[in-house]
């Protein structure tokens, strides 16, 4: 309904700091400042066509070569400067418009308001939600189940509101409005805790970790459960582009062929002359979040062996992920192994921090006290 309009070389940061990253190309370069979480990517139904349009585990390295990215760097796929019809575009002047108000937003806002006013969904509210989902599952074999049956089973206020909360996530992924939705629902802290716990629990399973004394301890006897989530994504190269062998929902046993023979291919290796793109490759999707080692990363000393002579290994949660919500987790979470339930009652401070230049020129009147901003 309304977009912020730009023209090439005269404005527009979309494709520069938001969208699929492009390291170098005839159409310029750009690196997204916004990544999506694996818990979000895995929340989609497999046949929801918004998934592929929203989440991508690759980026462009050159005009004709892609590189895979891990679960920490899931790309918002709705915009890409490689889709531009002109070359030699300034990096910060892509001319890609940015949506301000979409028709789907109007439909979902109407459905949400109707549910609140009537303390439950009316037929009109359900119809609005069906319209949005009808497009999302237009080509799905389970379309009737995902549209009509799904919505018709939402018959009370709470279940319909939860459906709206989820639908807005799936519909507007990467469009930079999710935080404000969560704030107005008073659901921001809960959403962060859900993400932290999801990543921790899934990664513990696939890395054979258990909690012991506030630490992640490796247990080789712990059975790996197929949770319908892929700890690794396997792929092949076809004409320089990545073709994934499995999706987010397909577990592959990396101890069995052909997956145990798969190799990694870093971006620096791709840039090397004579690099081989043959054979099955993989990128870590969830393995990245907790690294397992026999050495304490703080003291650089070995953990030693247990009573049976087995090498002791422990896991450490990815610091960048752990501190992504430092304003909420500060003072409560240091390793990721803690009970995070108390965080649900804590207010997340990151709403609209005051720019540092404004603070500096305010003669001490303004501050970001309470934001717990951490330069890390």
Residue ranges and their predicted role:
Residues 1-12, 49-376:
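Acidic/polar-rich alpha-helix caps and helix-coil junctions
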Residues 1-59:
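Hydrophobic-face positions in mid-chain alpha helices that act as interaction patches
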